[in-house]
Amino acid sequence: MDSRSRLEDNPNEHAVVVVTGAAGAVGSRVVRRLVHDHEGIDVRAVDKANVDARPGLDVKRVDLASDDLTSVFAGATSVVHLATAVTPDVNDPSADELELAIVSRVLDAAAEVGVSHVCVLSTAMVYGAWVDNPVPLTEDADVRPNPDFPWAITRAAVERAVLEWGSGREAAVSILRPTAVVTADTLGRLAQVLHTARVGIAADGDPPVQYLHVDDLAAAVVAAIQTRFDGVANVAPDSWIPPDALADLEGPQARVRVPAWAARAVAAVRQRSGLAPIPPGIVPYTSHSWVVANDRIRALGWEADYSNEEAWVVSHDPSPLEQLPARRRQELALGAAAALAIGCAVGAVLVLRRLRRN
């Protein structure tokens, strides 16, 4: 990154930062940090949902899919695109198409008004979860999301579009790849899907995991804005949670280990029936490591306030089961696992009978 691109190295330039998705969990925190902690930056909050008005904040209620964005972005020096139409727990091709169409509209408008910096959120899942992944993955690793997980594939497509836009243009492009994000008392959508996929009937494998608090992600976005970072950066706390430590945090779980192909089949059935939001493509991410290094984002002056373990703890509201003594929880977990195994066997028999009838 060229240090001359830093905001503090250009005191004569008036910074106007547009934040899309400003009503969301990440966007609202980014807006709040920019308004409260960074004098000399005008912040324009863009969302089709309501955004709380506050001094120093210009709020625009806009539908990114249809409204004129050139007028909304006029005068902006940075566009931080945090709005999204897709979630990791839903496979919707039309939403994927809309996501890419909105990205294209945002980039076209940014080019039209002469924006000099664009920042977007991707995901560490674009590296894919593969048996040969190094631990940890750096930004130099290939982008190869698992082919049957549409959400990660779409994030990789967003990255390509943004990088192509920045190629040959006098503008900095920041792409941030966070790991699974959590908030206070709540797992994020991705973290919840991963957790659900690892209990019950789960694939073999116990990879290390990472959890990123949403406040730390917002701080990383602000660091990219402040430095006008030009490049790709992973966002995760230092290190990761090894399997044995995660087991201690979670306590006994009802879990039946099966081959990956069987776990995928079960996930497909659970998703189609509405029992659980587990896309089959998430299964490899519960079997193989995809933890990432954070050296590059730390070089911008960013540091996580929450460790992986702390992020997990603050996001986790103990259930009545988890408040029972450890021995009793273990007994219940074993009983539940046995019930799951019996259920799987019965289900397999019923499926075979149906196939024979057909």
Where are these regions (language model features)?
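N-terminal Rossmann NAD(P)H-binding glycine-rich loop of SDR-like oxidoreductase domains
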Residues: 14-39
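Alpha-helical substrate-binding/gating segment
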Residues: 191-199, 206-241
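Amphipathic terminal alpha-helices
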Residues: 307-358
